[in-house]
Amino acid sequence: MHLELNERRRRVLKAVIQQYIDTATPVASQDLARSLGVSSATVRNEMAALEDAGLLTHLHTSAGRLPTDAGYRFFVENLMDRAALSTQEQRMIQHQFYQIRSELNQWIHLAAAVLARTAQTAAVVTPPRAYESRFKHIELISINDALVLLVLVLHEGSVKQQTLPADPNTTQEQLSRIAGRINELCHEASAKAIANIAHNQSTNQPPLSSFEVLVIESVARAMQQFEEHVNELIHHDGLLEMLHQPEFGQVTRVREVLSILEGGTMLESLIPQALASDGVQVIIGGEHSRDELRDYSVILSRYGVNGDVAGVVGVLGPRRMAYPRSISSVRYIAGVMSDLMGDLYGERKIEPSE
Amino acid sequence: MHLELNERRRRVLKAVIQQYIDTATPVASQDLARSLGVSSATVRNEMAALEDAGLLTHLHTSAGRLPTDAGYRFFVENLMDRAALSTQEQRMIQHQFYQIRSELNQWIHLAAAVLARTAQTAAVVTPPRAYESRFKHIELISINDALVLLVLVLHEGSVKQQTLPADPNTTQEQLSRIAGRINELCHEASAKAIANIAHNQSTNQPPLSSFEVLVIESVARAMQQFEEHVNELIHHDGLLEMLHQPEFGQVTRVREVLSILEGGTMLESLIPQALASDGVQVIIGGEHSRDELRDYSVILSRYGVNGDVAGVVGVLGPRRMAYPRSISSVRYIAGVMSDLMGDLYGERKIEPSE
DNA sequence: GTTAGCACTCCTCGGCCAAGAGTGCTAAAG
DNA sequence: CTTTAGCACTCTTGGCCGAGGAGTGCTAAC
């Protein structure tokens, strides 16, 4: 991967990629001659060499050069200026997260919005998910004669709600007592452990009422669903802005992007991969085996608290993407979100029990 | 609006519109001659009359006819067959809602998905919102030494969560006691009433601790925000499928739709209008004053429990939309959702107090 | 009132050509 | 051996033209 390239050849490659990212037009030898202080013929020779090396290509004889996947890859790994976001931008982002730090379920909206604006492409964010969710607390609230609202709080802070049928005339006091008992029974338990509590009735003293069993089973089911992330949704933002990029001149491109985002590729393939990796993942075009990604690049990072709970944040854009800026943005925002989550319950890791 | 049109002329108009909806191609006199049992010349005469009446138009001399806004309007109000969904479809939809009836926050996802598939256009759904939200219940859950999770349940069943800073070493028992006191203080109260509780400290006996005031203020703020629907989001689905329609041949169309959905037109203009109206609203093309809607039609219906809590469900598509099917779908799904919400807490309306 | 016939209009699409962009090669210069 | 000027060559792009075709509007006959 790390090819032998002399200094000037690297400069040419870098210049081609930067200009192509900037203008979306194949770059001609003439364009670089001036800034490199050599003639266009010399640049052409260098370009031809880079093309032999598989880093550049061109669309037809009389067209300028543009990078291949390998070219972009080399750029990202060896050539690119790793510019961080300006401190001003960092402050703004921090500030916005600070504003809503208490509203957990707005995080993903904010993260997607900020990332889309900062990286100037479409952003994707998944909500944080526990590897193994642990029970924290339930609450039972009477809604009317026959219905009860079950609010389930999981350890990493996510809240699930559900309604359950109840015996008529169950009072709120009774419900609170029941909730209290279940909270003790299920304290810190995993989904499996809770399912067992409902099934191995005999060990419970006094035995559980049928309503209590129903509640416990509902809790177990909700936690299992949560772990299998049946409900996991990808939130995205910035699609509209991305459509102004020239690569989206025809509607099929738009359809491709939408079907990557909403049609499963993201969820089935990219997100799991990002969850399983450390650091920022950069996937350029056809490097990924999924054919529908051929013309797109994806930059993803896990965020969260190590080994405890994690989500994914990142961007999706055309292969011709502002890699330096996008990578910095993804890295920075993943960091901010991880810090915030650390504040919320990272400490618990250090002080083992509550 | 209700023009004088003889029977045959109505038949011609209806046939033109149905065929145009079907094929997206201007319809020629020849196309209708067979099915109407007259010659193409006769059809042409009728078409010319309909054009004079402002119900049809054509793009250039040698092109077939297509409906104007007024033509579609006449069709929707006087000509269209009001076919209900098949009982099989109805059962399927009912069944799907039944499956997730307990998971309130999945309703809008399901509704949008089902509607998009049934009506075969893009669907939009807003979550149910109370006209004036009333306090139901809070719960305070210790997350770690310095942070507390506040879970707020509103009367119509929605749940808000928020984290608050707390004195170190506050125990869960203390928090539960505080929650209990606040639950009593705020019982069934409105946002304003709760804000007053926090401000008119003097009336409280014993006086509220600073943490209690913080909690109450947070509750009041959350409820106010909820009423002003600062956070109200429109969920949509089916965009990808709609892009296969021939009107989306160029990307500007896609941008237009996205900016209607996400750029404010929906939220600022259409949703409030639908919330304020009874029944199914049909807005055809330029009938609405917003220029960006010129080429689109919108069908919206309020759903919910009358005077208590309501949301909006509907579809957005090209003007050439399958009105009969879309209108039936929107009406039916709004009905199903209203029924479900009625089950949840509509009864309360009949039995005045809890 | 209906319809056959026909002239007329306007769009669509393919082919063609000129202009332009940019390369690759060659041969000369450094 | 590297660099560069020069030039022929290739391929795209955009405009233009003209044939073909679709569908109308009108007129005159039924």
UniProtKB/Swiss-Prot annotation, chains A, B:
Protein name in the entry: Heat-inducible transcription repressor HrcA
Keyword Transcription: yes
One Pfam family here: HrcA
Originating species: Herpetosiphon aurantiacus (strain ATCC 23779 / DSM 785 / 114-95)
Keyword list, A-Z: Repressor, Stress response, Transcription, Transcription regulation
Function: Negative regulator of class I heat shock genes (grpE-dnaK-dnaJ and groELS operons). Prevents heat-shock induction of these operons.
UniProt-listed PANTHER family: HEAT-INDUCIBLE TRANSCRIPTION REPRESSOR HRCA
Keyword Cytoplasm included in the entry's annotation: no
Superkingdom of source: Bacteria
GO biological process terms held by the UniProt record: negative regulation of DNA-templated transcription
Protein family (similarity comment): Belongs to the HrcA family.
Gene Ontology MF terms: DNA binding
